[in-house]
Amino acid sequence: MISELSINVSQNGGACTYVLTGRIDSTTAPQLAANIHLEGVRELVFDLAGIDYLSSAGLRVFLQAQTTMNKAGGAMRIIHCRPHIQGLFSAVGFTAIMDIA
């Protein structure tokens, strides 16, 4: 299976939203990480409505973004998760340390 990830970014002042579509796996996670620019961002939102697969490599990208936002005093939210993606976040304990809906 060919891994594909579409990344659409919108920024409004200190708020930045990433709308992601496709798969986040060991092939596409580096692409996502390279596209996350947090300088001056106070509120970071990842919209995962279009994500149908998330691997540990993708989880690591979100954990790194959360850590960076915490150190900068900003906020991060992950929204519109499909049930199986929400279940994965819950199973690994991310729902205890991140704002995930």
Where on the chain are the PLM-derived regions?
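STAS-typified acidic loop motif
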Residues: S3-L32, Y53
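Short amphipathic beta-strand starts and helix->beta connectors
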Residues: M1-E4, R60
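Amphipathic alpha-helical interaction surfaces in cytosolic regulatory modules
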Residues: S26-I97
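Short acidic-hydrophobic, aromatic-tinged amphipathic segments that line or gate anion-handling sites
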Residues: D99-A101
